Structures are given as C-alpha cells and as structure tokens.
C-alpha cells in the first residue's frame, strides 16, 4: 500500500487532460493525468488547489495516481 502525499496543483490543462502538482516539502513537480483524478463528473484540477495523491515511478519520471482534491481547505 502506498502512502498518500499532499501538494498543490501548479497548473492543469483541461484541453490536454494533464498538469503538474507541486509536492508539499519536496523539490520537483509530479505529472498528473485526468484519468487518475478521483471525483464524480468532469475530472479536472485548478491551479492552487490542494490535493492528496500517490506517487508512482513511470517511464518518464514520477507521476501521480489516485489524485483526490482536498475539500474545504479555507472555508472562511
């Protein structure tokens, strides 16, 4: 079982279906594909959004799997 990491969405391109996450307390960016986003309806992320995810090693570097948006970060 992988542990979940947290980070902030750097950018996400809806037309291309991918973007990058800045991991919390780590250097480098993590690739995120729309197919790994765990949510109902249209799967998308927004820049600045907090997410939790699992990190996997892929052929082109690290990528996020099982991306879950963190709700209610600053509900004030």
From Swiss-Prot:
GO terms for biological process: regulation of DNA-templated transcription; regulation of gene expression. GO terms for cellular component: cytosol. Keywords: Activator, Cytoplasm, DNA-binding, Transcription, Transcription regulation. It is found in: Cytoplasm. It comes from the Bacteria. Pfam families: CSD. One of its GO terms (molecular function) is DNA binding. Residues 7-67 form the CSD domain. Gene3D superfamilies: Nucleic acid-binding proteins (2.40.50.140). InterPro entries: Cold_shock_CspA, CSD, CSD_CS, CSP_DNA-bd, CspD, NA-bd_OB-fold. PANTHER family: COLD SHOCK DOMAIN PROTEIN 2, COLD SHOCK PROTEIN 2-LIKE. This is Cold shock-like protein CspD. It comes from Vibrio cholerae serotype O1 (strain ATCC 39315 / El Tor Inaba N16961). The gene is cspD.
